[in-house]
Amino acid sequence: MDDDDFGGFEAAETFDGGNGETQTTSPAIPWAAFPTVSGVHLSPPSPEIVLDHDHSSAIDCLSSDAIISSPENTHAENSIVSQTIPKAQIQQSTHTHLDISLFPLGLTDEKSNGTIALVDDSEDPGANVSNIQLRQKISSLEIKLKVSEEEKQRIKQDVESLMEKHNVLEKGFLKEKEQEAISFQDRYKELQEKHKQELEDMRKAGHEALSIIVDEYKHQRLLEMLDTEKELLKGKIKEALIQQSQEQKEILEKCLEEERQRNKEALVSAAKLEKEAMKDAVLKVVEEERKNSEKAHAEERELWKTEHAKDQEKVSQEIQKAIQEQRKISQETVKAAIIEEQKRSEKAVEEAVKRTRDELIEYIKEQKRLDQVIRQRSLSSLELFLSCAQKQLSALIATEPVDIE
């Protein structure tokens, strides 16, 4: 539906007449354009109006038939158009129709600025009569213009009221649709949460069942492996202890033999040193005594013998005492060495047992860690499988139409 259906309010256009003459531009509507003729032109404001008698019939025809329609026809046409035009087109064309004035308003403006002067090259005697008729028609046109202006204002008010009603209805419709969309969205969210919770429950149930089965299997397998490793470690510990005791026994025998040899050599060397020392001392004493005895050889010979016997006795006693002390020291040294060697061997055995126990614990921890890694991998693969299944279920749920009514 174009703009002519709403009363023909549109911008002025220029049309060419059928005889090739340029038509005057109507300020409001295209059908108000009329051809200009020779001797007729617009002039500045003038108190006189001269009309060409030859063209008076054409002007009368235009003024009576084509210049403007009656207020009743305009009102009927506008009422029919207002009933048939959709709301969207009324919105789009409201500003255009309200801003465009009618042709009679243009004539009124022209009249307010100055009167229309129609000048003919040759003056007729009936020009005064035509001027009077033209004045009467102009006055009637002014009355019709006022009526059309009032009709225009009334139409403008009707359009504004219709626009306000349309805006109110549109706001109510949009609010209702927004509330429906919010309710639909809430219901969709509830359904989505429900499906999500059901999928989560299914995933948790499957995960728990699988984790229980895997834990049972791992526990059984770990017990079997621990039993096997325990038997193997018992055999290894027994063999290691036997071998360690044999080695400790051999080392102890070697140490005792070496210690015995060292003690024997030490005793021999000590006896030799003591003997040499005593011999030197005895020789010195003998030399002194010999010198003294040379002076009193006869008297002191007996004394010297007795003293010499005493000295020999003392020397033998000292030698025996030194030998006994050396023997006690050697025995104590051997006992201390044996006790220390026993303690060392016991400590070595304890360290070997502790080291073996630590190695066993480390091995068990390593096995537990490997089992944990395998379990984590299994759980990760299961989690990946369940997430893929959840995505597929979400995709299937999204592709199916949701019954929201």
UniProtKB/Swiss-Prot annotation:
It is a peripheral membrane protein. The keyword NADP does not apply. The modification Phosphoserine is found at residues 43, 46. It comes from the Eukaryota. Residues 126-376 form a coiled coil. It is found in: Membrane; Golgi apparatus, trans-Golgi network membrane; Golgi apparatus, trans-Golgi network. Keywords: Coiled coil, Golgi apparatus, Membrane, Phosphoprotein, Protein transport, Transport. Homodimer. Interacts with GGA1, GGA2 and AP1G1. Residues 1-27 are annotated as: Disordered. GO terms for biological process: Golgi to lysosome transport; protein transport. It comes from Pongo abelii (Sumatran orangutan). Residues 1-16 are annotated as: GGA1-binding motif. Residues 210-377 are annotated as: Homodimerization. This is Coiled-coil domain-containing protein 91. InterPro entries: CCDC91 (IPR034592). The keyword Phosphoprotein applies. Involved in the regulation of membrane traffic through the trans-Golgi network (TGN). Functions in close cooperation with the GGAs in the sorting of hydrolases to lysosomes. One of its GO terms (cellular component) is membrane.
